[in-house]
Design a protein with these regions (language model features):
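Long low-complexity, Ser/Thr/Pro- and charged-rich intrinsically disordered regions
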Residues: 232, 255-257
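N-terminal targeting/regulatory segments, especially signal peptides of secretory
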Residues: 1-250
Length: 257
């Protein structure tokens, strides 16, 4: 199994702006002025200015979602929140291969989120805390999540006649294939229990219709329509000959009776 080139996959994804719509859901996030829990990062051993800013922004987002949790936009925000959150962590913590459990302020942040939601907001947007997972893994999970959310739109591109767009998406799907195979082996193998059909995770679906190979085959067939062929009939050729053929001869000495 070929290793996933995460940098290449991320580059191809950015070329198509696939995560833009999801990142935009958090673009107007401000800071919470309601809760003081984030002050734990203001001083002492836990002092961490970037963690405090992220904490306040996170609580603001959660407050906003809680106002209308069932709206289409907020359902999307809630679903994408874990990937946004760990993406923000990647921006303020440079040791991306370090396990989550070894980065102390992450546990503090997720506990604050849990306590605020449990005791005050009464609505839960999950942010999983797996101490044995690192930030590099969360980067791959985000890319996988985006693929499955973009699948149907890519399929529509594949049946279009826009060759340039097809080629761009072809490069993207091709770069995702190694990660798909990696996660399929991890999440979709039944382990010998034939009666058990795994469904996958939030970021990976064990459904054959999502296989990249199927999208690749369709994208490779994508081509612009051929220009209509001009058919020349015998009658049109005759008319053409009369209109633009030889000039009739003129006999000046011949007298017509």
């Amino acid at each position: 199994m070929s290793k996933t080139d995460v940098t290449k996959l991320e580059t191809e994804s950015k070329k198509l702006d696939l995560s833009k719509a999801y990142d935009a859901l958090f673009s107007n996030a401000s800071t919470s002025k309601t809760y003081t829990q984030c002050n734990v990062f203001s001083s002492g051993e836990k002092k961490h200015e970037d963690a405090k800013k992220l904490c306040s922004k996170l609580l603001y987002i959660l407050e906003d979602i809680a106002k209308s949790p069932k709206s289409t936009e907020n359902v999307k925000r809630c679903s994408y929140l874990p990937y946004w959150f760990y993406d923000q962590i990647r921006g303020i913590h440079t040791e991306h291969s370090k396990k989550i459990g070894e980065i102390s302020f992450i546990k503090e942040l997720t506990d604050i989120r849990k306590n605020v939601y449990k005791n005050e907001l009464k609505n839960m947007c999950e942010i999983p805390y797996d101490k044995d997972v690192n930030l590099d893994e969360w980067r791959k999970r985000k890319l996988s999540y985006i693929y499955f959310k973009s699948h149907d739109n890519i399929k529509n591109i594949s049946i279009s006649t826009k060759k340039t767009e097809c080629d761009k998406h072809l490069a993207y799907v091709d770069s995702f294939t190694p990660l798909y195979k990696e996660y399929y082996e991890k999440h979709c193998r039944s382990g010998g229990f034939l009666w058990f059909s795994p469904v996958g995770t939030d970021y990976f679906r064990c459904i054959s219709s999502y296989e990249p190979s199927k999208l690749l085959a369709e994208l490779k067939l994508c081509k612009p329509p051929e220009p209509p062929k001009i058919r020349t009939s015998a009658s049109s050729a005759l008319v053409s000959g009369k209109a633009g053929g030889a000039t009739p001869e003129v006999y000046p000495d011949r007298v017509l009776m």
